[in-house]
Amino acid sequence: MTKKEQERNILAETEMLSEEQQAEILEKFDTESKVRKFSGKRVAFIVAAIAIFYSLFHLYITFYPMPALQQRAVHVAVGMALVFLIYPTYSSQNRTRVAIYDWLLFLLALASAGYLIVEYTNIVTTRGGIPNTLDIVFAIMTVILILEAARRVTGWILPVLALIFLVYPFISHYSWIPRKMMTRQYDLGDIFGQMYLKTEGLYSTAIGASVSFIFLFILFGAFLAKSEWASYSMI
């Protein structure tokens, strides 16, 4: 059987499937098919406004940079906020409206960056990066939000891998851990303070590269794709 005949057979089999089955197959392989299709203009306007702010923010900090921790926190927080509005909790959820708890997650995502912006001076100068109870609460909340946002977009694999590495520092001092993999005992402040209050954890070099280069590259590509310049570039 030739390759063209195989393609015809696959196409014929696909046409025999119901719309629901076709949508299920598309959703499995196409991430964009999982997003919500808003029935009202209000939520669509809010999402568009946040996306425009997100783009303008990255252009602004290119010329007027903020402290690395703050700009990376905003980058992650607004990205998460958009995920909670655009991606449903699970595939069978109603995709024409945003659930109340998704609005709550949206606000908490923004709060994760807002706290670092408001408390930045106290964190860096007054406390020298040593976390207090409120810091730890916001750190744990931010980690949970990131894991949930990753699950909605990519599935369970990445969040589970992240959880394994997150749990490891809490158990790495026990005697049943192989000697070469043992570490000293860490507490919540050590782990979540490092992850949330410094640029070696959640807001590390990878996020820095996303803020400074990757997002701008994608933004420029999206601009070209939606403008007439794309047709000229193909000439």
Model-flagged regions — what are they?
Residues 1-130, 136-140:
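Conserved, well-structured core domains of diverse proteins
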Residues 40-43, 128, 150, 207, ...:
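Generic amphipathic alpha-helical segments used as scaffolds and interaction surfaces in large
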Residues 60-65, 145-152:
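Hydrophobic alpha-helical transmembrane segments
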Residues 63, 121, 154-157, 174:
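Short secondary-structure junctions and interdomain/linker hinges
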Residues 99-106, 130, 134-137, 147-172:
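Membrane-interface loop-to-helix entry segments
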Residues 85-94, 146-151, 226, 231:
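C-terminal ends of transmembrane helices
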Residues 123, 143, 160-163, 171-235:
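Membrane-embedded alpha-helical segments and adjacent helix-loop junctions characteristic
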